[in-house]
Amino acid sequence: MVVGGGGEGDQKRSSGEMMAMASLFNDQQNPIQQFQVKFKEVETNFKTWLSKQSIPVEAAVVSTMSGVQGAFIGGLMGTLSPEMPQAGVDPQAIASMKQAQALVGGPWVQARNFAAITGVNAGIASVMKRIRGKEDIESAVVAALGSGFAYSLVSQGLQGQPMNAITTAAGFAVFQGVFFKLGERFSKPSTEDPFFTRGRTMLVKLGLEKYEKNFKKGLLTDPTLPLLTDSALKDANIPPGPRLMILDHIQRDPEIKGKRK
């Protein structure tokens, strides 16, 4: 009985030391890495919350956020745009440049234009994605048509000719369609392995996402997480510090720990 009690005490002491070392290792993480992990966590939680809202609410939130970003970019571009030279320039060239400058406008005008383009585009794209359940060229073209009309409306007002608005919207749609197709052609679709979803989430939360390849090479799939041991992680070539953090996280996570029983 005494021997059994001593063994149990040693096991608890060893577990406590492991948790303390994991906590110390976690505290010594790079602050930039910690910020990135927290940012990803907040972003994931926000996207999860947004996906549960109604279509009008999601469209309003996405349009507002994208519009603010567009206004900032447009204002910055308007502020940094070079001044028009006056001396030694042909008068006809100056007149043409003045017309172009009047069309583009200063920081406030560009902020307004970019806010309309990005806000409407993002809002329509979110609605199309919720309705169609995917992001495709049709959704991109419809969103571009809407942003083209919005740009024409805010830049020319109700006095602009309808044909100009149609031409602008069509130009936006063609450009967006070509850009979407080029993106599809040159980018490789990232297919997430469903057997490593929980493990990937855990590694990102701990700031250890670079060891995802080790998990895949060692076939440490989601069903094996409750069974993980130090030797199994060592066989997957994961260093001692990250091993302690992973085991500590599994021990603290009630959902993973509960599957051991």
From Swiss-Prot:
One of its GO terms (biological process) is mitochondrion organization. It comes from Arabidopsis thaliana (Mouse-ear cress). It comes from the Eukaryota. Keywords: Chloroplast, Membrane, Plastid, Plastid inner membrane, Protein transport, Transmembrane, Transmembrane helix, Transport. The gene is HP30-1. This is Chloroplastic import inner membrane translocase subunit HP30-1. Belongs to the Tim17/Tim22/Tim23 family. Disruption phenotype: Plants lacking both HP30-1 and HP30-2 are yellow to pale-green and impaired import of CEQORH in chloroplast inner membranes. InterPro entries: SAM, SAM/pointed_sf, TIM22. It is a multi-pass membrane protein. Together with HP30-2 and HP20, triggers the import and insertion of transit sequence-less multi-pass transmembrane proteins (e.g. CEQORH) into the chloroplastic inner membrane. The lineage of its organism: Eukaryota, Viridiplantae, Streptophyta, Embryophyta, Tracheophyta. Probable component of a protein-conducting channel made of HP30-1, HP30-2 and HP20 that mediates the import of transit sequence-less proteins into the chloroplastic inner membrane. Interacts with CEQORH. It is found in: Plastid, Chloroplast inner membrane. The chain crosses the membrane at residues 59-77, 113-129, 139-155, 163-180. One of its GO terms (cellular component) is plastid.
